[in-house]
């Protein structure tokens, strides 16, 4: 039987079907997460890709022939409903154009977020709308151009983006005063980050930014008044750290009642800690550290700040003290407490009232006695404990405890006993342990092997001895950095196979190690190895060529033999130091290191000639005190080498003019060789400090630890989160040795950047001293002593305005000492002894401090320095006329002297021999004396 449906029922059914179809479409939309992007925006993205030279990595954007959905492309975010592009992440572009064309963003009219951080364009332009580019992006709320290197020229473009709520300018080259006028139209700003720029001066009235909730001005050069900040009544987070603010903290800050984060650390605020902080009822993060505060600080100021979670206080003045309040029970419960340089003698009692501390930093105080192990017992969630630079003397640990502590720093205390045997059992989760600069003794406890997660271990500068425990070598499989230097460890380094598959940095210098065992061979991850100043014997293992070292230090050991050729073929080297051993054989023909690498092969027994290509990629080349021979090669061009040290070999020939092409040289040492000929006049082309292209600093180890646990102790809402993370890197020191001011000094780090010197002493150089050397205005040390240089001291030496040491002793120089040399204000050493100089010694300036030892051996000099009067006018006139007569007469006189001496010597011997030919009593006495001497010698 057929059922009949009314028209109304049919209409309802059709409507239900339609609804179901719509629901299916919505369901399909939800399944895909978005609808396809519009074609105009897709083409706009492809134009961006072409203009920005974007490769497939790190951008997964297809080519023009692929009609894929751009909403699915990486770094592109679309609205789920409209399919319009609302977010672009254009960070880390490898080869961007010099200028960014802002008109390329016109197609993205709904854009809300634009991230151009680490983009590294030099500036912006728009040929269509000029500065009004961002005016077209009416929905743009977040703009991030951090770490770009742009300057203030981009600010007029940004000022038209009136819809902006978040603006991040961190890490650029902006300068001048606070950019209030340049950003006057950004009235909707809620977060402004100006950190890590070069802004200066006071803070203006910021009432125009009435919506601002987060302001980061850190790491600039702001100074003067900061009262303009008091207008920001809605401000919740304020970071003024690392600036140059001075004086008292403004009292008007107590009106910022909504502040949750206040960081004024690393400034020059002085006086007592501002009492206004007691009124900041909403504050959760309060950092007052690294200022010049002094006097007593009472915890009563913060006792009622019930929301406080992080409190940091320290002072560079060393005049800040914490007032003792034993009965104080604050309302806050801290997660982080830092009280550095507060002259604490005991752990403050209020800490006992805290229930869940994660970070305790009491470093740089005066804590004494036993390590406060009760902190481990009371706070099971404690993750960071910093007690370095105190005076603790005894390390005791709880017996039955398995703690979650991850960072412990006890360096620079007065511990002088053995480590607790259970240290590894108590701290099995430790990741960063620093026990350096103490007096710990005996061998390492085997329980170190329980530290499965440890990544950084510093045991340097103690009195540990013995060999490394096998349980330690096998158990600490996560170790990244191991520092054992300045102890008494002995035996072979890693005598057996280890489990250090992640070890990158091994620093074990200044111990008693005697050999390199095969256990080291398996640590292929090593990038830094320092075994200098030990007693290593034998040869460098051939398998060393399999490592990709960046830094290798084997100096001052007993190693010998030739060097493995594979050692010099790695492009990763930055420093290779094999000095102070007994290596022999020829030098390698090349050194394939990284740009600006340092090569030390000095104080060995290398022989043969110097390869001309050895200098190619080096910043410092030290070949001093070997057995190298031949001539100085015609080095290949190197515009960056700063120091060339060839002293103490047997090099012969002339000084090649090719050295004048090493324009960046700061220190050139060719002393103690057998070089002949004249000094090249073109040496004035060498920099010696006149062209400072770059400076050399301590190398930060380029190895970081990717740690999942960043030790986040407080998460900020608006400004960039600050997280606690230890420094796993450290600084590598390098040095260059050079003789100056009558002593041999080692120039390290920054001191090298201020040293410029030329040493050609103890050779066989002749001829005049080139007047062109007077062009080396920034040179600080000049040594031409112990040669056969003749002629006059150049008058141009008066131009050496930075000179500190001039040594011209033991030459054949004649004539007067130029009086203008008395204008050299920095000169400490001026030695011209044992020459043929004449005339008066300058008596003004630095010459008034010189004694007679600097002028001895010059019979015709006079002056107060040698207590010889110059009042005899006839003598003075004679000396002056003699000086003007030229070199020829002086040369003839010297020849007559030498010929006369030789003739006298020859005539004396001939007379003696003729005398013996005649029979006489004297002849018989002489031969009797000779016979008696021979008999006596035979008896002996």
Curated annotation (Swiss-Prot):
What top-level branch of life does the organism fall under?
Eukaryota
LRR repeats, residue ranges: 108-136, 137-163, 165-185, 186-211, 213-232, 233-255, 257-279, 281-304, 306-330, 331-354, 355-378, 379-402, 403-426, 427-450, 452-475, 477-502, 503-522, 523-546, 547-570, 571-593, 595-615, 616-639, 641-662, 663-686, 752-776, 777-799, 801-824, 826-849
List the carbohydrate attachment sites. 53, 63, 66, 101, 115, 151, 270, 304, 361, 389, 402, 434, 463, 685, 783, 799, 831, 836, 867, 873
InterPro entries xrefs: Leu-rich_rpt (IPR001611), Leu-rich_rpt_typical-subtyp (IPR003591), LRR_dom_sf (IPR032675), LRR_N_plant-typ (IPR013210), RLP_Defense_Trigger (IPR051502)
An annotated GO cellular component of this protein is: plasma membrane
Q: Which SMART domains match?
A: LRR_SD22, LRR_TYP
Keywords recorded for this protein, A-Z: Cell membrane, Glycoprotein, Leucine-rich repeat, Membrane, Receptor, Repeat, Signal, Transmembrane, Transmembrane helix
Q: How does it sit in the membrane?
A: Single-pass type I membrane protein
- Where mainly found? membrane
Record's SUPFAM superfamilies?
Answer: L domain-like (SSF52058), RNI-like (SSF52047)
- Mapped to this chain, the residue ranges on the Cytoplasmic side of the membrane are 917-940
Where does the record locate the signal sequence feature? 1-28
Q: Could you list which ranges are Extracellular topological domains?
A: 29-895
Q: Which positions, given as ranges, span the membrane?
A: 896-916
Locations listed in the record: Cell membrane
| Protein family according to the UniProt entry | Belongs to the RLP family.
UniProt name for this protein: Receptor-like protein 9b
- Taxonomic lineage of the native organism: Eukaryota, Viridiplantae, Streptophyta, Embryophyta, Tracheophyta
Gene this protein is translated from:
RLP9B
């Amino acid at each position: 039987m057929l059922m009949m449906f009314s028209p109304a029922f049919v209409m309802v059914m059709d409507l239900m079907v339609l609804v179901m179809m719509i629901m299916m479409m919505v369901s399909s939309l939800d399944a895909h997460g978005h609808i396809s992007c519009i074609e105009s925006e897709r083409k706009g993205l492809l134009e961006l890709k072409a203009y920005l030279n974007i490769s497939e990595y790190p951008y997964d954007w297809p080519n023009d022939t692929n009609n894929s959905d751009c909403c699915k492309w990486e770094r592109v975010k679309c609205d789920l409903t409209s399919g319009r592009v609302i977010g672009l992440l254009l960070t880390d572009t490898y080869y961007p154009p010099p200028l960014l064309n802002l008109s390329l963003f016109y197609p993205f009219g709904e854009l809300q977020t634009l991230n151009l951080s680490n983009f590294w364009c030099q500036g912006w332009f728009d040929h269509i709308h000029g500065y009004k580019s961002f005016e077209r992006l009416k929905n743009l709320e977040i703009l991030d151009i951090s770490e770009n290197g742009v300057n203030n020229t981009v600010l007029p473009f940004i000022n038209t983006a009136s819809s902006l709520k978040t603006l991040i300018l961190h890490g650029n080259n902006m300068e001048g005063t606070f950019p209030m006028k340049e950003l006057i139209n950004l009235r909707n700003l809620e977060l402004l980050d100006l950190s890590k720029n070069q802004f200066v001066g006071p803070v203006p009235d910021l009432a125009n930014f009435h919506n601002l909730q987060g302001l980061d001005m850190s790491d600039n050069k702001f100074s003067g008044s900061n009262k303009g900040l008091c207008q920001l009544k809605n401000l919740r987070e304020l970071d003024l750290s690392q600036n140059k603010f001075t004086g008292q903290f403004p009292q008007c800050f107590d009106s910022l009642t909504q502040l949750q984060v206040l960081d004024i650390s690393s400034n020059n605020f002085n006086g007592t800690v501002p009492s206004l902080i007691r009124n900041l009822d909403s504050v959760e993060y309060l950092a007052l550290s690294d200022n010049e505060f002094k006097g007593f600080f009472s915890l009563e100021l913060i006792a009622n700040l019930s929301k406080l979670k992080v409190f940091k206080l320290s002072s560079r003045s060393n005049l800040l003290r914490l007032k003792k309040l034993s009965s104080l029970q604050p309302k806050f419960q801290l997660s982080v407490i830092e009280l550095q340089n507060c002259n604490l003698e005991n752990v403050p009692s209020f800490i006992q009232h805290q229930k869940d501390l994660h970070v305790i930093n009491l470093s740089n105080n005066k804590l004494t006695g036993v390590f406060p192990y009760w902190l481990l017992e009371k706070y099971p969630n404690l993750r960071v404990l910093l007690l370095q630079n105190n005076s603790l003397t005894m390390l005791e640990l709880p017996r039955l405890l398995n703690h979650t502590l991850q960072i412990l720093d006890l360096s620079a205390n007065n511990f002088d006993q053995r480590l607790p045997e259970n240290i590894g059992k108590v701290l099995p989760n430790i990741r960063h342990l620093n026990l350096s600069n103490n007096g710990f003794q005996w061998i390492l406890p085997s329980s170190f092997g329980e530290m499965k997660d440890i990544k950084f271990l510093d045991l340097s500068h103690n009195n540990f001895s013995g060999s490394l425990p096998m349980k330690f070598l096998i158990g600490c499989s996560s170790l990244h950095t191991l520092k054992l230097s300045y102890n008494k460890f002995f035996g072979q380094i890693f005598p057996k196979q280890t489990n250090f598959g992640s070890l990158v940095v091994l620093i074990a210098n200044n111990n008693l190690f005697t050999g390199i065992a095969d256990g080291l061979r398996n640590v292929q991850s090593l990038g830094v190895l320092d075994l200098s100043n030990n007693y290593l014997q034998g040869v460098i293992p051939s398998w060393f060529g399999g490592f990709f070292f960046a830094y290798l230090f084997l100096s001052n050991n007993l190693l010998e033999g030739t060097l493995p050729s594979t050692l010099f073929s790695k492009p990763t080297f930055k420093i290779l130091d094999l000095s102070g051993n007994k290596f022999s054989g020829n030098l390698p023909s090349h050194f394939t290191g990284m740009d600006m690498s340092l090569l030390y092969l000095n104080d060995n027994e290398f022989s043969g000639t110097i390869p001309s290509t050895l200098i190619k990629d080096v910043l410092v080349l030290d070949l001093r005190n070997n057995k190298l021979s031949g001539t100085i090669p015609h080095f290949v061009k190197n515009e960056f080498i700063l120091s060339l040290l060839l002293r103490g070999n047997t090099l012969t020939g002339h000084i090649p003019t090719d050295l004048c092409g090493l324009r960046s040289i700061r220190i050139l040492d060719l002393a103690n060789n057998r070089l002949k000929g004249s000094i090249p006049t073109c040496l004035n082309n060498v920099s010696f400090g006149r062209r400072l292209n770059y400076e050399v600093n301590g190398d930060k180890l380029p190895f970081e630890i990717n740690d999942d646990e960043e030790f986040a102790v407080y998460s900020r809402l608006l400004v960039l989160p600050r997280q606690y993370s230890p420094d796993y890197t450290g600084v590598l020191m390098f040095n260059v040795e050079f003789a100056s001011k009558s002593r041999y000094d080692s120039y390290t780090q920054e001191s090298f950047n201020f040293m410029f010197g030329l040493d050609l002493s103890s050779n066989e150089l002749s001829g005049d001293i080139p007047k062109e050397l007077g062009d080396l205005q920034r040179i600080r040390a000049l040594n031409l002593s112990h040669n056969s240089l003749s002629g006059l001291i150049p008058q141009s030496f008066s131009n050496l305005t930075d000179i500190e040491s001039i040594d011209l002793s033991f030459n054949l120089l004649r004539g007067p000492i130029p009086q203008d040399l008395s204008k050299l204000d920095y000169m400490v050493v001026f030695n011209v002894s044992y020459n043929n100089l004449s005339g008066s010694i300058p008596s003004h300036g630095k010459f008034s401090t010189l004694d007679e030892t600097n002028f001895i051996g010059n019979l015709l000099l006079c002056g107060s320095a040698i207590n010889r009067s110059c009042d005899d006018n006839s003598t003075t006139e004679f000396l002056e006329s003699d000086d003007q007569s030229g070199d020829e007469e002086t040369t003839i006189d010297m020849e007559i002297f030498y010929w006369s001496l030789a003739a006298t010597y020859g005539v004396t011997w001939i007379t003696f021999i003729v005398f013996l030919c005649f029979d006489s009593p004297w002849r018989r006495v002489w031969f009797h004396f000779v016979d008696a001497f021979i008999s006596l010698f035979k008896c002996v």
